C-alpha cells in the first residue's frame, strides 16, 4: 500500500461516494473489501509502518457538537498516522456556541478549504445536511439516534478477526436499543453480511418497529443470549431518556446486566463487546468486561484502523469528483 501510484477509490459508500453518512443499503460486496483494507491498516499500525504521506497536505477537521473523547481521539490519531493536518473543533470553543447556525458553520468551513470533515451531532441528519452544503468529504461520527457507521465497521472487523466471517453468526445487541445509533448501524451491517441479529432489553428501551429491520426481539437476557456467538452490550443513555423508562441502575443490572451467569448461556467462547464508555455494574459486570472473552480493547484498536481506511478512501473519492 505504501508503494506505487494510488489506486482509484473503490466506491464502498454507494449512496454518497464522497461521504460516509450511514450503512443502510450497503452491499456485502462493498463491505468485505473495505474490511480487508482496514485489516491491512491494523497490521501496519502494529508494525508502526503506516503510510504517513497518504493524507499529506490534507486538512481534517473534527467538528464535535457532542462530547466524545474516545471517538474524536480515534479519528485524530487515524488522520495523523496518514500525515494529515488535524483541527479539533468543539461547541464550547466555536462560534456555534455564540448563536451561529449549522449552515453558517458550513459556509465558514467551505471558505477554509477543508478536505475532510468528521461530524458528531445530537440531531439526526446533521452530517447529511452539512454534506449537501460543503465541498469537503463528510464522515458521520454519530448523529442523534440515527447512525454511527464507523463504530459498526470496527465492530465487524473485530468479529471477523475472530470468526473469519460474519455470515451465519448470531449476534445479540443488548440494552438501550431505542437511543442507540450504534445498534442501528450494526443492525444494517450485520444483517447485510448474513448474520442473525437479536435485540435484547426491556420493552421500554426496544423500539416497537425494530423487527422490520430483520431482527429477533427478546425481553429477557436468558432467552436473548442463548447460543449466541457475540454479545454486544450497549450503554444506558440516560441523557436521551424521558423519565420512568428505567427504575434505577441497580434494577437495570439485576435484569439486564451482563454477568458470568448470563454469559454462560451463550456459545462457549462467545465474544463480549461494548462500544464504550462502559458503565460497570450497570450494563456489564467488571469480571466479564475484563475476561478473556472480552474484545473491548481490541475494538478500540480496530477503531483507529477503520477510520484510517475511511479517511483514505474518502480522500481518494474527493480527488475523483
From Swiss-Prot:
Pathway: Pyrimidine metabolism; UMP biosynthesis via de novo pathway; (S)-dihydroorotate from bicarbonate: step 2/3. The keyword Transport does not apply. NCBIfam families: asp_carb_tr, PRK00856.1. Belongs to the aspartate/ornithine carbamoyltransferase superfamily. ATCase family. Heterododecamer (2C3:3R2) of six catalytic PyrB chains organized as two trimers (C3), and six regulatory PyrI chains organized as three dimers (R2). Catalyzes the condensation of carbamoyl phosphate and aspartate to form carbamoyl aspartate and inorganic phosphate, the committed step in the de novo pyrimidine nucleotide biosynthesis pathway. This is Aspartate carbamoyltransferase catalytic subunit.
Amino acid at each position: 500500500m505504501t508503494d506505487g501510484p494510488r489506486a482509484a477509490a473503490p466506491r464502498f459508500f454507494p449512496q454518497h461516494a464522497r461521504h460516509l453518512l450511514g450503512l443502510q443499503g450497503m452491499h456485502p460486496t462493498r463491505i468485505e473489501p473495505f474490511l480487508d483494507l482496514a485489516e491491512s491498516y491494523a497490521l501496519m499500525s502494529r508494525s508502526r509502518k503506516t503510510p504517513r504521506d497518504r493524507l499529506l497536505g490534507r486538512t481534517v477537521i473534527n467538528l464535535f457538537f457532542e462530547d466524545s473523547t474516545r471517538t474524536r481521539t480515534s479519528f485524530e490519531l487515524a488522520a495523523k498516522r496518514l500525515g494529515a493536518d488535524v483541527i479539533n473543533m468543539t461547541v464550547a470553543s466555536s462560534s456555534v456556541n455564540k448563536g451561529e447556525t449549522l449552515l453558517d458553520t458550513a459556509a465558514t468551513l467551505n471558505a477554509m478549504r477543508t478536505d475532510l470533515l468528521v461530524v458528531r451531532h445530537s440531531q439526526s441528519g446533521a452530517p447529511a445536511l452539512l454534506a449537501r452544503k460543503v465541498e469537503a468529504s463528510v464522515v458521520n461520527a454519530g448523529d442523534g439516534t440515527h447512525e454511527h457507521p464507523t463504530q459498526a465497521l470496527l465492530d465487524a472487523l473485530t468479529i471477523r478477526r475472530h470468526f473469519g466471517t460474519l455470515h451465519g453468526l448470531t449476534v445479540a445487541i443488548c440494552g438501550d436499543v431505542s437511543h442507540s445509533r450504534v445498534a442501528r448501524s450494526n443492525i444494517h451491517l450485520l444483517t447485510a453480511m448474513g448474520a442473525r441479529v437479536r435485540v435484547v432489553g426491556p420493552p421500554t428501551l426496544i423500539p416497537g418497529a425494530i423487527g422490520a429491520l430483520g431482527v429477533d426481539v427478546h425481553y429477557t437476557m436468558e432467552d436473548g443470549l442463548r447460543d449466541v456467538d457475540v454479545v454486544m452490550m450497549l450503554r444506558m443513555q440516560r441523557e436521551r431518556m424521558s423519565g420512568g423508562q428505567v427504575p434505577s441502575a441497580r434494577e437495570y443490572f439485576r435484569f439486564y446486566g451482563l454477568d458470568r451467569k448470563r454469559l454462560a448461556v451463550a456459545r462457549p467462547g462467545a465474544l463480549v463487546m461494548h462500544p464504550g464508555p462502559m458503565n460497570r455494574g450497570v450494563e456489564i459486570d467488571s469480571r466479564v468486561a475484563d475476561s478473556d472473552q472480552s474484545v473491548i480493547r481490541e475494538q478500540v484498536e480496530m477503531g483507529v484502523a477503520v477510520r484510517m481506511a475511511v479517511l483514505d478512501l474518502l480522500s481518494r473519492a474527493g480527488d475523483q469528483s
